[in-house]
């Protein structure tokens, strides 16, 4: 068995496992946060590198991930059922604000979530149209689609899915649900009928991508407030990280990666200062909060071959200054 598989679960191959953990520059007695436990691949590798004085706090909003985390019997390990935007609250509760040596975030939907038809994330398997990361909170995708306006749905598809046929698809979905109400038939409550409706609404097909890919992504991102959560955790990392603490983030689509890249770049440059202004280096650096570490990392060919879902992954790492 490869070392990669040792730290991955049978149902989920952890993407950029060693690269993301190496990005944390682990201290054996450090305090770390795995903001997206999933099935614990990154967490288990981190724990294997910490001494008995090290500490790891893991977070996930998926009840099934929490169940998997509770199987880890380790006094250095603590699991929180929450979203990673709650990191400031969790750190304050545990007395760890400004003491965290590293935060790891593995964004997006996990393989177990995609592969479980009952979760409603996949357009390839028939299941209830749910899409919630935390199934105990909020509206399901089906409930939201039954009440959203055509204009708002088109905006979501365009903004979060970068879908060029957003208006056509939104019109088809809203029309279908309206007709169902009028005729006393069932509205869209399952994944495959939605995927088929989207495919019919799209005039041009991409032979490399299912026509429902962008729409499913957009609806999922909206239902789970994924980009709002990401923006929140990026800023809160500045508060909870210790000096020289690391932020290691894996993203899977351009919207996430763009947000991470721009945030790290902006925080590494600080506020713009007019040229020629006589300032000492410490004054110039005062507004810089992060230092970007290396270049963006993508999976090697061997990893993509073993796990095709890793193809779009991008890892970015930054270090807290001062």
UniProtKB/Swiss-Prot annotation:
It catalyses: cytidine(1402) in 16S rRNA + S-adenosyl-L-methionine = N(4)-methylcytidine(1402) in 16S rRNA + S-adenosyl-L-homocysteine + H(+). Pfam families: Methyltransf_5. One of its GO terms (cellular component) is cytoplasm. One of its GO terms (molecular function) is rRNA (cytosine-N4-)-methyltransferase activity. It comes from the Bacteria. Its EC number is 2.1.1.199. One of its GO terms (biological process) is rRNA base methylation. Gene3D superfamilies: Putative methyltransferase TM0872, insert domain, Vaccinia Virus protein VP39. S-adenosyl-L-methionine binds at residues 40-42, 60, 84, 106, 113. It is an enzyme of class 2 (transferase). It is found in: Cytoplasm. Specifically methylates the N4 position of cytidine in position 1402 (C1402) of 16S rRNA. Belongs to the methyltransferase superfamily. RsmH family. NCBIfam families: 16S rRNA (cytosine(1402)-N(4))-methyltransferase RsmH (TIGR00006). This is Ribosomal RNA small subunit methyltransferase H. The lineage of its organism: Bacteria, Pseudomonadati, Pseudomonadota, Gammaproteobacteria, Pasteurellales. The gene is rsmH.
């Amino acid at each position: 068995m490869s070392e990669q598989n040792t730290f991955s679960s049978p149902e989920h191959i952890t993407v950029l496992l060693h690269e993301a953990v190496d990005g944390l520059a682990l201290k054996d007695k450090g305090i770390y946060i795995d903001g997206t436990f999933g099935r614990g691949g990154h967490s288990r590798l981190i724990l294997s590198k910490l001494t008995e004085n090290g500490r790891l706090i893991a977070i996930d909003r998926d009840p099934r991930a929490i169940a998997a985390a509770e199987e880890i019997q380790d006094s250095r390990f603590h699991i929180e059922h929450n979203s990673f935007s709650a990191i400031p609250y969790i750190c304050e509760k545990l007395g760890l604000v400004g003491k965290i040596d590293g935060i790891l975030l593995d964004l997006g939907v996990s393989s177990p979530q995609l592969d479980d038809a009952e979760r409603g994330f996949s357009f390839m398997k028939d299941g209830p149209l749910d899409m919630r990361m935390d199934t105990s909170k909020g509206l399901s995708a089906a409930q939201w689609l039954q009440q959203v306006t055509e204009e708002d749905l088109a905006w979501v598809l365009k903004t979060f899915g970068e879908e060029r046929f957003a208006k056509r698809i939104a019109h088809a979905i809203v029309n279908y649900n309206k007709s169902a109400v009028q005729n006393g038939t069932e509205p869209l409550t399952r994944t495959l009928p939605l995927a088929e409706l989207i495919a019919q609404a799209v005039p041009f097909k991409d032979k490399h991508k299912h026509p429902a890919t962008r729409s499913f992504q957009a609806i999922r991102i909206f239902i789970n407030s994924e980009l709002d959560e990401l923006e929140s955790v990026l800023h809160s990392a500045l508060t909870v990280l210790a000096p020289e603490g690391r932020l290691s983030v894996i993203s899977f689509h351009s919207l996430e990666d763009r947000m991470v890249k721009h945030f790290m770049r902006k925080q590494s440059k600080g506020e713009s200062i007019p040229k020629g202004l006589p300032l000492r280096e410490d004054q110039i650096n005062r507004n810089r909060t992060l230092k970007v570490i290396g270049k963006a990392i993508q999976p090697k060919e061997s990893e993509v071959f073993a796990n095709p879902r890793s193809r779009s992954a991008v890892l970015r790492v930054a270090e807290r200054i001062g």
